[in-house]
Amino acid sequence: MDVDFVMSNKTIRHCLGLIVLSWTGLASAASISVEIRQTGGGFDIQGSYMSPLTQCQAYVLLTDFSSDEPSEGIKSSKITRLSDQTIRVEQKVEDRFLFFTTKFESIIDYTEYPMRGMDLQQVKGYFKEYRGSWRLIPKEGGTLFTYQAFILPESSIPMFLIEHFMNNRVQQRFEKMANRANRKKDFIPERCQ
């Protein structure tokens, strides 16, 4: 009888451990929100994730255009400051889905709003139109990154590719950004000291 009781306790502890691990995973997933809606021939994207970073740390991370960390699909990148608040990022990108490989050049202008976020506008690239914004909202325990964008795809791109990208890649990229923010929580940039 005592043996059964001990085994039950071990089983209960094991199950509780799995529940805690599952809950932690759900909490991380719950801090990332992505909503994609088709509208006006394009896609409206709303997304957000919570980070443990201060607003200053979050802004430095958001505007780190010259990061050495590899980004999926980006083959080369050139950064040019156009004004005190505007940066142009030119990239050569190669993206792969199933048997399809897409190569394109992208030029995006970013207008920075120190400590608050930035707006972005595609000048040249994969889409007919791509514009959006990032905003940083200080919260208790960190900073909320919020993203809003409108993407109007080229009509020559097969719709199933666009839908796959929108439904899978956007969520994956938000998860990577949130993970990167979590890894940087102990790094205090010089301008935040």
Show the residue positions of the predicted features.
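N-terminal signal peptide c-region/cleavage motif recognized by signal peptidases
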Residues: 24-26
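Hydrophobic ligand-binding cavity/cleft-lining segments
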Residues: 29-84
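Short, surface-exposed coil-to-beta transition loops
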Residues: 44-46, 101-106, 128-133
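Short, low-complexity Ser/Thr-rich regulatory SLiMs
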Residues: 38, 81, 110-112, 134-140
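Beta-strand/loop substructures that line and gate deep hydrophobic ligand-binding cavities in soluble
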Residues: 122-172
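Extracytoplasmic/secreted envelope proteins and their assembly/folding machinery
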Residues: 55, 59-63, 76, 133, ...
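Bacterial N-terminal signal peptides that target proteins for export
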Residues: 4-16
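Glycine-rich portal/gate segments that line the openings of hydrophobic small-molecule binding cavities
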Residues: 50, 69, 73, 78-124, ...
